[in-house]
């Protein structure tokens, strides 16, 4: 780390932040601050600071009231009632007309919102009075309220061009979005300024923290950098078990990976505990499913696949590869940490007779290849999963791209039937059991090899108080964070 520090010192400016601003360092600029278009993780995290949603989520990923409460009148009709204190940043009340305009905009095919598909079950949305909204569904959906995480815009803004909005319904208002990607926000309750600063290089972000040019850096720091920062005076590291799910995806349309025994051999060849300990510095938890154990539909009896190289070799032999080494290509991003992970996987698979060829690609090419099915194996993560509809999106046979996210072309009639049954079940306890069955089926079939959930981390300067992190890595704590004097520190 010392060499990295010396090499990067010239990149750190001497500029000090304004005393009235709290500065958050992020690795990439948001693509949009418009809730109709905020589909990448950074855009979504910042957009929700500016645009409040009808529905929020508790720690078990259950829907709870946000801007509104609701009732289900029948299987395809939900009525939402807005809170009386909901206001835009100009002081106007948030009304049913604003909600209707926001949802109709996203549902309009001409807008080309990336969020439209997630709301495809809405047949109609109508204002009953100034605070009441009715949603009519195409099909019954007992989990429908959980799909309404879209930030609400003022009606005039919702009808306007992308990112041209003026009024915020969330805890912050927008001061400026600069050409370099930096964002200036003002907290509505007390006027505190928050500067969101793009610093692409992780080492430079760390150095800016030390220099006092940043106050908070959340996530996207290598484990060794976090360990080093934890030893620095004037800084502290906070952590929270995360829900970012990492996995290996397979192309099941042709080749040796169509054989479940080969996929199972790969799963048993991976020493998850060793990778979590040595590479992640214990800042991850081994996974058995997409959804963490804290999720309300997580199957309680799932077990992380065992590290068992003897069994892996036996499975490969049974699949016809006992006398020859199987060669497979693994696509990943060119990020240095992901390449180190790929090398560890390569070494572990080599021990059971699998030769893993690493194909590192820039992010755009890599993600494009995965979406187009141009891979044998790839490594990716799901960020912030809350809804069990991920099972349809990722594993139903009708969800192959471009209709969905079944990128590996997994096709099992039993899984399809379980997904459809779970979606149509209206009784919560029976629905939960159906999702448990889906998770067990996927752990057996292994269209994905589950790896781990990465821990959420943040590094704070000592004078920053009131900042906590949650499981999905949101920036929501900016609504309560504040700077304290030396006498107030604890």
What is each residue range found by the language model?
Residues 15, 355-366, 393-462, 490:
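Extracytoplasmic/peripheral linker and loop segments enriched in polar/acidic and small residues
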Residues 26-75, 81, 104, 167-169:
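N-terminal lobe/hinge region of extracytoplasmic solute-binding protein
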Residues 60, 139-195, 201-204, 309-310, ...:
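Gly/Pro-rich hinge or "lid" segments in bacterial periplasmic/extracellular proteins
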Residues 69-112, 128, 134, 205-208, ...:
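Aromatic- and charge-enriched surface segment that lines or borders ligand/interaction sites
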Residues 73, 81, 114-157:
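Surface-exposed binding/hinge segments that line
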Residues 181, 186-227, 346, 355-357:
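Ligand-site clamp/hinge motif
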Residues 257-347, 411, 418, 437, ...:
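Append "and occasionally in soluble cytosolic enzymes with long acidic Gly/Pro-rich linkers
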Residues 458-490:
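Long beta-strand-rich cores associated with HINT superfamily self-processing modules
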